[in-house]
């Protein structure tokens, strides 16, 4: 078998070699890498924000030129970590990262419909005993707000470096937001508010990269 792996544009050669060896150790005969920019880039001018679990990438391309290509290791994982802290401060119970991610998804769904829903999960006390937890979705909003606002500030900074003609183009045609954070209420709203432009969100979250890769042929 062979694999084609989409990676952050700034992934070092050493990191690629480590990943390649890991795949080879699993029996994969051929490993190729392609950057997220290469997968998602379009012929027309494009402003891409790809924010998943581990990192956020910002790419701005036009006229066969890359104006911005930035990778920041700050994304959904930081939301989950903040939710863990918030829940512990409110209840005294520790929840797993999986449960934190679930709360993020459920809270985000509630925010989209302007609701303050009651969320449920389980947490561990200091003796590792499991307890049911009920919290309102508004309790986890500060975690989503913190990360979303920071991502939007980076996007705004990149936007401000562009020539006026490109700024006008993206104000009209919008910014594309993909990755798992595109499913989350917050990033698109903050970006749209800061730049006053449309934000075109993927409808399938983390699966959009997989779909894009299906059309890529290996060398």
PLM segments and residue spans:
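Nucleotide/phosphate-binding catalytic cleft detector across ATP-hydrolyzing
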Residues: 1-51, 61-175, 182-208, 214-219
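Short beta-strand motif preference
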Residues: 56-58
